[in-house]
Structure formats: C-alpha cells, structure tokens
Amino acid sequence: MTDDFSLIVAPATAENPRNTEGDIVVLRDGRLLLAWSDFYAGEMPDAAPARISAMLSNDGGRTWGERFTLQENIGGQNVMSVSFLRLHSGDLLFFFLQKNSDADLQALMRRSGDDGRTWSEPVMCTDGAGYYVVNNARVVQLASGRLVLPASRHADIHGEGGGAVSQAWLSDDEGRTWRRSESSIRLPLRGAMEPGVVELRDGRILMIIRTQLGQIYRSFSADQGATWTEAEPMGVRAPVAPSTITRIPSTGDLLLIWNDNWDPEHAGGGIRTPLVAALSADEGASWPRRRVLEDAPDRGFAYTSVTFDGDRVLLTYWVHEPTEAGHRLHLKFRSLAVGWFYGE
C-alpha cells in the first residue's frame, strides 16, 4: 500500500466555510489525532466564531472518525490555530489561540498525561496584554528541554501603529510558566510576522519570518531563544504568506515548505501557490532540493503542519477554493514517504 495519498479531511460548506490551521500528533497506540480551527457559524474572517475540532484515524490517515470538539470557543471572538507537542517526558501539550478582540489575542496551553484522553485547564503562555499571533504547528522543545513558542506581537492588526514584532516565549518547566525573550525582531512595512523555529546542530535556533519584502527573512539565537540577531534575507522568495520549517528525524536534513512565488504588483505579494518543499543539508545555508506539493493557479495553499510517523511525512494545509459566492477554505491531509522529498 502506497504511502502517498491525500484527502480533504475537513471539507468546507456554507455553514462551515473555513477549516484551517491544523496539526497532527501520533498517539502512543499508533492512532493519529488531528485538530484544526473549525469556523462553525457560516463566517470566514479571522475574527469569526470558531472552535477547535478534532478527529482520530486508526489507519494512518486513510479514514477518519467522527468530528468532535477538542476546545470549545472560550474567546470573545474565537479559539483557533492548533499546535501539538510531545514532550521528552512523554506528556502531550495542546496549544491554541484565544481571540477576544482586535487588540487581545493570547496563546494558551493544555496538558495531557494520558495521551489525550483528558486535558488540564488552559494555562496562558503570553502575558494577557497584547495581540500575539502564533501559527499552527509552531511550538518546539529544544534538546535542553526548554520550550520555545514563536509569536508575533501586533500593535494593530489592521496595519496602523507599526508593524508586527517577532519574539519567543520560553518555558523551562514543561509549560507551567512562561517568559518573553529579552529581544525582539523588527522589519519594515507590516513587520516581522508569523515566525517559526528549528534547533540547529550547533545548538543555535533558526527563526524564519513572514515579511512583506519579497522573501523569507531569518534570525538566529545562540542562547536558547533569549536574544535574537537582526533579521536578514534568507534568499528564498515568498509572498506575504507563512512558511514552515522542521528537521527530518531519519535524515537530519532541514525541510522548508512555503509558497515559491513573488509578485510585487499583487496586494499580497503574489498568490499562495505553488506550495513547494525544499531540503537543506547545510543547516539552511542553501535549499537545492525542491519538489512541488501543489501547483494550481486557481487555488491557494497555506498554513502547513508537518508530523513524522516512521518513514512517512504527514502534512495538513488549507486549500483556498473560489466559488460563485466567494471562496471557501478546506483542510487537506497528505501522506508522503520521506523518500518523496528526495525524488525517490
């Protein structure tokens, strides 16, 4: 049976027009737990009502059980944007955003010691006094045990009052308490947005950053996320859209997934297609191996999660589909062999 298959796992409908920002974790018994932002009230904007819904798969993602609610909407507007993290200790963490207003967006975390059967009450990771964007599938645990939650703080999400500032929130007690990094990262125009991080072999942390400057920018931390270098161009063109970076456990190479596109005449710097994967064997200095995941000119693809399950790579991302009434956002699941990324 092939490892390469895909399906729209959470199709959008008129009543549920947006299913986005998901993540997957492999449970100890081999089942897959998928969760995502479920916009349930017939509206699509980022501030529309949403809950965190979930499904389980017993067969590696080929089929999925009934949808259930993992996190009710406790926000003034919604809850959204899922990150799962399996700790070195074995416990499972579930992160999400609580959106209360255009000036109040916080990252929360719940813990499970029984592999997702029960969850603790939410703990706030950010400070409760700002608008913090944390993308799906973003939180990492370093080799030291420290947790790093990359976030961008927005003074005004409508573009006034300065651009976004990227930073990290850090925990040395498995998420029980959190503190902000000592330095932040600033860039022109809309700023340093939607950061993601990966630990490098030399112990530094690489942060990749969404920008309005035509390419992905990067910053480094040599002290476990406490301070960060000034951001610099990464040499990878990109529209105003997020990118995802991680390390393939079986090969040690870095994996980058993003929209390989840039059009300065377009309002968003270009459409969110194609969706491309690239490999780096030199810790992000170059990205010579590239393969196209999606390439439909009338669609968009973004907000990718990456989960490794043995020799398989499990992806989720949203698919933007235009309709006569406007558009919808479906959640897609895709399974690929690790070898696919190497052209095998």
Q: PLM features: residue spans?
A:
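Asp-box/BNR beta-propeller blade signature and adjacent active/binding-site loops
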Residues: 1-344
